[in-house]
Every structure is written in C-alpha cells, then in structure tokens.
C-alpha cells in the first residue's frame, strides 16, 4: 500500500530537474561495477601487469603501477562505492560535479574502447598477446552506452 511518504518521494523523484543526470551517473557507476566484475572473473591482470612491464621498458616515465589481485580489486570496489556516494551531489545539482562527470565519462569511454580494440587486435602492445576476447570485453558495451548517456545529460 502506498503511504503518504511514498507518494511524496515519487513526487520528489519526478520533479527533480537533475533526475536524468542522476540516473545517467548511476548507470555509469553500475556499468563500471559490472566491468570490474567482468575483469576480475576473466583474468584482466594477466594482461594488464605484463603490458605495464613492457611499457615501462620503453617509457619509464609512465606512472602505471603493477597490482596484486586483492589490491587491484579493493581499489576498484572503493572507487565504485565513492562514485556512488557522489551521486547525492549529482542529485542535488552541484555544479562542481560536472567536470568530474565529464572526466568519469571520458575515462570510461576510453576504457570500453580499449577493451574492444584489444579484442580486435588480440594484443595491448606488440609483445603482449592474449586469446580473444580481451578480459573485460563483455561489459565494454555497457561502459560505452552509459558513458554516452552521461555525456549527453551533462
């Protein structure tokens, strides 16, 4: 049964001018969570860590770290939780969230494209080849769609 509190909540949801941006933000956060699960279950670090090591040989100034599985997964889970916590500010229409939103969307767009291109080419750098599809490939379309959605709403 709908209580008056439920009705008021629905009215607030429908009348918020930032609701579309909020849902776009949530969609990208959930797409990222799905992507993390995809990468974790398909062995992403078996491609990422050797790629970083190969890049360090030719470009030692690149600051990419090598990860253990636990540290990598914990860091990404914390990042997803923090991004979801920021959704409160998106809901409220905080102007300072716009640049963060653009950065988040562009990085996730590049991430999704990177996994798709990695799958097409079967490698990250010349010396690092892997069986197709690249780990994280299956969730990449969700990253692309959610990134585009957020960019359109920004």
Positions of the model-derived regions?
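Membrane-interfacial loop-to-transmembrane alpha-helix junctions, especially the N-terminal start
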Residues: 21-25, 96-104
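Terminal transmembrane helical module of multi-pass membrane proteins
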Residues: 142-154
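Core segments of transmembrane alpha-helices
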Residues: 70-87, 138-144
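N-terminal signal-anchor transmembrane alpha helix
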Residues: 17-42
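Juxtamembrane "helix-exit" motif on the non-cytosolic side of transmembrane helices
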Residues: 88-92, 114-124
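Non-cytosolic membrane-interface motifs at loop->transmembrane helix junctions
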Residues: 100, 120-139
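Perimembrane loop-to-helix junctions flanking transmembrane segments
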Residues: 48-63
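Aromatic-anchored segments of alpha-helical transmembrane domains
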Residues: 32-34, 106-116
């Amino acid at each position: 049964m709908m209580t008056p509190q439920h009705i008021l909540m629905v009215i607030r949801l429908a009348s918020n001018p930032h609701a579309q941006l909020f849902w776009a933000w949530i969609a990208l956060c959930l797409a990222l969570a799905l992507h993390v699960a995809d990468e974790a279950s398909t062995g992403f670090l078996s491609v990422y860590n050797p790629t970083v090591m190969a890049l360090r040989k030719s470009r030692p100034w690149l600051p990419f770290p090598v990860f253990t599985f636990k540290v990598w997964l914990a860091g990404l889970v914390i990042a997803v939780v923090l991004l979801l916590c920021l959704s409160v500010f998106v809901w409220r229409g905080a102007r300072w969230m716009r640049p963060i939103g653009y950065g988040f969307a562009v990085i996730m767009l590049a991430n999704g494209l990177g996994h798709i291109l990695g799958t097409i080419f079967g490698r990250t750098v010349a010396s690092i080849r892997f069986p197709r599809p690249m780990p994280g490939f299956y969730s990449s379309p969700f990253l692309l769609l959610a990134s585009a959605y957020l960019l359109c709403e920004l």
